[in-house]
């Protein structure tokens, strides 16, 4: 029996969902959770109860945890490109290693692993713009994905409309930066 109940809000892989139902003997004699994605109206997901492990299904973070995560953004590390360079002697190989690092962090489904992706892409983009170049397609893809995942979960955790989450993030991060000075 799952530790979740109908009506619970959970994160399943890359989706914030409500547990809509427990379907007993739904497929091949297994019990399944029916999940309704909150930000993708027509998406329903079915997860075998015995496969609903903490690796891919977890409760939504609490409001306290969400605020603590936002407050930690100022001091959060970026992905250390210099540590990746010995294995990536060319710019193309470095881009590939960065993509692998982004993928590795996304696979954890942990909100605290999304922040370094976003901070790294932001720093890389600033450097590129300063040298007359644009954001890479890979960086844009992973930034948008990480931002979407984080904002979806924060919207529910903080009970804030999805479209206002970025404003809440920016305001709170600026406040945290001001306190550091």
Which sequence ranges carry the predicted segments?
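A positional/architectural concept
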Residues: 1-57
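Charge/polar-rich, low-complexity and marginally structured segments
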Residues: 55-181
